[in-house]
Amino acid sequence: MQIPYRRVEEYQKVDIGALRPAGSYKQLIDKRTHPIDELVRQHGKIPDDLLIPRTCPTCGSADARHELDKDHLRIVRCNRCDLVYVNPTFDEAHYKRVYVSAEYQEIVRDLGIKSHEYRTKRFGQERVRLMSDQLPGIASPRFLDVGCSTGFVVEAARDAGWDAIGIDLNPSAVEYGQSRGLNLRAVALEESGYKPGSFDAVSLFDVLEHLLDPVRTLRACAQLLRPGGIVFLYVPNYDSASRMLMGKDAHFIWPTHHLNYYTPATIRDLMTRQSLDTVYLATEGLDLVDYLWYRREVQGRSDDGVEEIADLLQFFVNAGAYGKNLRVIARKQTR
């Protein structure tokens, strides 16, 4: 399928100050490698006995070539399906500890909770509208947001009259959403107990890139859908302007946390392998904002002329399929 045509008049700007409260994004970047810092301090690297070889998480092939190294970890490209992924990795228990750690909860508080209301209005409502477009004739869709964080999409869906539920591993995020009256649970998908075929829509926003086995999770989500139901996901776009401008310094290349890197082609391939028909694919990002931040904070340079037209440039980046985030809606086949 083709990237949809977009009109510049429809471009919605992002209030960076509201999205990223003062200091919160820098804190996230500064603590990027914190889970491995002590290991590297003691050993000069990540000890080999802590790392586990991994085959391609999409097609299962072990045939891959070196792509790049960052943060003492290796990223490779599958020679069969072209997926880019981290290999080797830590075990699953390591990543679960990271996402429930006190430090990660602090990051969520500073970045997610403080911007929750803005995220609900700017992003939550937009995502609900995009899902609604794919669910005609369903007055009150039943919706599950997997990895819901503070529940800003769940809140927008609830306010639109949906039966909206969210699950997340981070207890601080879930507790905050519950304090707003949202139906959130601090539970893993595989332990949630939801019945197959019980949802009209399931979302995975900024989730698949974190998983050792994204196919297992995507398959579980597909099983929860009724025939004709949709899965809506966001993942970083490896073919984005961010990587073209900053190379491996692009912020989304974060191998201590992001284990899988998709392109429009490889994300469509993943959907097809799970009998999901891609019905919507677009890109959206803050590539120019992140690049200007990088130039200013890391390189000590200023690009005032670019800053003045960054929003307009970002529209064309998004429309050309080079935005930092891939937005994909895929439908469960009815046959």
Residue ranges and their predicted role:
Residues 76, 209-213, 262:
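Residue-level signal for the nucleotide or nucleotide-sugar donor/cofactor binding architecture
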Residues 136, 212, 226:
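Short conserved AdoMet
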Residues 212-216, 243:
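Short N-terminal helix/helix-N-cap motif within the alpha/beta-hydrolase-1
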